[in-house]
């Protein structure tokens, strides 16, 4: 099965109106590439503004959401609100949510289930820390994080898995093409065993972790790497080269 290439841009807590305008300008000026799903995730205050300015071929995602539609949850946003803005995607389980904000596998799984039930597609992030990799626990950590949503019986057609080795996020260190492909292959084998061969074949598994215009082409050639989740590089014009890494 041919899986459509997916490139996400996670702006994290960066930007203002002027910088959003700058990013919109270079994205709107880029040649349309219908062979790639392009989704960018601005900070919550700029979601509606970015959506109003971006061309039709670039979708907008939220960076996070909570597990219920509304209520006394100060500072949170819900999938219902994301949908009300006309958006289709949310990023969940990012390592910064797990490690800076203490989100557990169980909470992330609940949030994922609720987002999917509300009609929002999910970029579901997993990944190991450096000490976990060095201790030989890469497979265990990633499988544990995935098992949390497998146990919930989620529907997989609206999930993209983002493998982001924590030791490579924002550090300038990148997993080699071989290291990334190895883990992506393990993830696909896990889906085949725990869910179904059809889901394993159809689910897009994208790589994140210091992806740049320089390394994207090599990573994009690997058979189980179906795209990228890009951090800092998505704020710069070179992001267009990453979008077109397979072209």
Curated annotation (Swiss-Prot):
GO molecular function, one term: methylglyoxal synthase activity
Coarse class of the protein's main subcellular location: cytoplasm
This protein's name: Triosephosphate isomerase
Localization per Swiss-Prot or TrEMBL: Cytoplasm
Biological or metabolic pathway of the protein: Carbohydrate biosynthesis; gluconeogenesis; Carbohydrate degradation; glycolysis; D-glyceraldehyde 3-phosphate from glycerone phosphate: step 1/1
Quaternary organization: Homodimer.
Known EC number: 5.3.1.1, 4.2.3.3
